[in-house]
Amino acid sequence: MIGFGEEDYPSLLAECGDPPLALYFNASSPPAAVLEMRPCIAVVGTRDLSPYGRDWCRRLVLAMGEASVPPCIVSGLAFGADGIAHRTALECGLTTVGVMATGIEKVYPWQHTELAGEMVRTPGCAVVTDYPTGSAPVALNFIRRNRIIAGLSRATVVIESKTKGGSLITAKYACDYNRDVYALPGRADDVRSAGCNSLIRQRMADIVTDPEDLVERLGLGKTARRRKAGLETLLGRKYGADSPLIRLALVVKGRPGISLDEIVRETGWSWPEVQERAAILETDGYLETDLLRRCTIPAKIV
């Protein structure tokens, strides 16, 4: 258990006007390693996700998994968007935190017991609650649980929500805490998107239309796909789209610290060709080498 005011109490949650007095914490890593090492992003939505919602939930979390600054995905361990967000985070190597509306020993719904167990065993992941042992999953608990999801996170992303859905409550808490809110738009006649459309219409949430754009707006840098495209575009303008210098740079970007000998083996080029091309990139500031001739792309480029 972590008490309010203690060193391990989550800093973002402590900033809220109504922080819980204590958090029960179940994880294989210490609290600070879970909640302070990475930016926390809440991903929430209805339990009754449409195929459109399921697809976008996965796409958004997978894009965050490719970000320059990988986040920790926070959600509520419920059916629908929550479960997909947690599982996708684990699948792509992100950490994830499940906030429960029960005592720490009781996973609700019980069908997510195995998922919660995997989260507890995975370094950097956790299951948390502010309810003491023995607390049952009553309706009021879920409203209070939602404020913790919003409070732990620098931003909240709503996948699908009805106008009276719990995800809408989470989004409103996030607004109250001066945190960013993003919402996936849906059809005007789809009740599962009515809440998201309302958030966007009232300007309580920014619209989500592109996973990679969302990653950048969340302050997580660029995705691997955009970083690669950015490097190719930059070098293409400099040397021409078909230049072998682009391939060399992409090889180095994919394997930071690769030696010139390894580049020879990977590309099939001769040693003089590799040496000459590396020298051009280094002279132009697109490549760095150390005393052992190990190559990296400068951080300012990628």
Q: Model-predicted segments: where are they?
A:
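Glycine-biased, small-residue-rich flexible motifs in mid-sequence functional cores and linkers
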Residues: 2-302
